[in-house]
Amino acid sequence: MRLVFAGTPEFARIALDALLAAGHDVPLVLTQPDRPAGRGLKLTPSPVKQAALAAGIEVAQPRSLRLDGRYPDEAAAARAQLERVAPDVMVVAAYGLILPQWTLDLPRLGCLNIHASLLPRWRGAAPIQRAIEAGDAETGVTIMQMDAGLDTGDMLLERAVPIGAQQTAAQLHDELARVGGQAIVDALAALAQGGLAPRRQPDAGVTYAAKLYKAEAALDCSLPAAVLARRVRAFNPVPGATIRLPGLDDPVKVWRAQALEQAAGGTSGAVLRADAQGIDIATGQGVLRLLELQKAGGKRQPVDVFVRGWQP
């Protein structure tokens, strides 16, 4: 099948690789413009762009696809490229730009999105992190026929994935990326044979996965320890959960923690114990044990190493 691929981060790169491995003709890739990255803030191409160039695929990087927006010339150029390649379908995965109606209408079979949740739960920007934060037992991938709404299109295929008790957002991301890559390959194969029936999303069970903000990273110790432990996992690696510890001017990043079902016995945020087993923090309900930390400007350390250079 002849398709255009639109995506930007590693999640999308894995899907592109799966499509190419399945033998699909991908003459054009859309991805976000190069961004400054690293300590030197060097302009760096997205993972999708790197994969596309390595495969000899033409790449377009418009800042917008809106013909009436801030960059109409770039949008018009992208439209001309899409019309020239005349795709059967556009596959979209974490692209990062809004697709205007002309884009949705241009491919013969429309635009298919790889969404990292079981819709209609967790529509929006951060479905992986919000599923972990909420304590969901499972999530998954939905292949969706895109429409003008926010992840509201008809569902074509779903694949469920259990969420491990200690699984981080980074680990779940990698698993869902793999599942998503196979799911879109399977969906396109079924679509080509007319064996994929769109299903309207149910009205019940709609939730929204709001974008992650850096301000969320600071752990509020008045909350239950179980909630805080989930946030540590959900915000690993970005934005990274942080906590303030006595004797340190800057917040400390928390990479691993666990909730202990025991009475806190102290004011929320107080350090109850600090040794090689963990740093125990009183919370609104239970105790949060910190297991892996990172000082500002330092390296990640297991707690037994961390406590050697710090005492409350």
UniProtKB/Swiss-Prot annotation:
One of its GO terms (molecular function) is methionyl-tRNA formyltransferase activity. It catalyses: L-methionyl-tRNA(fMet) + (6R)-10-formyltetrahydrofolate = N-formyl-L-methionyl-tRNA(fMet) + (6S)-5,6,7,8-tetrahydrofolate + H(+). Its EC number is 2.1.2.9. (6S)-5,6,7,8-tetrahydrofolate binds at S117, L118, L119, P120. One of its GO terms (cellular component) is cytosol. The keyword Protein biosynthesis applies. It is an enzyme of class 2 (transferase). Pfam families: Formyl_trans_C, Formyl_trans_N. Keywords: Protein biosynthesis, Transferase. InterPro entries: Fmt, Formyl_trans_C, Formyl_trans_C_sf, Formyl_transf_N, Formyl_transf_N_sf, Formyl_transferase-like_C_sf, GART_AS, Met-tRNA-FMT_C. Belongs to the Fmt family. PANTHER family: METHIONYL-TRNA FORMYLTRANSFERASE, METHIONYL-TRNA FORMYLTRANSFERASE, MITOCHONDRIAL. Attaches a formyl group to the free amino group of methionyl-tRNA(fMet). The formyl group appears to play a dual role in the initiator identity of N-formylmethionyl-tRNA by promoting its recognition by IF2 and preventing the misappropriation of this tRNA by the elongation apparatus. HAMAP family: Formyl_trans (MF_00182). This is Methionyl-tRNA formyltransferase. It comes from Bordetella pertussis (strain Tohama I / ATCC BAA-589 / NCTC 13251).
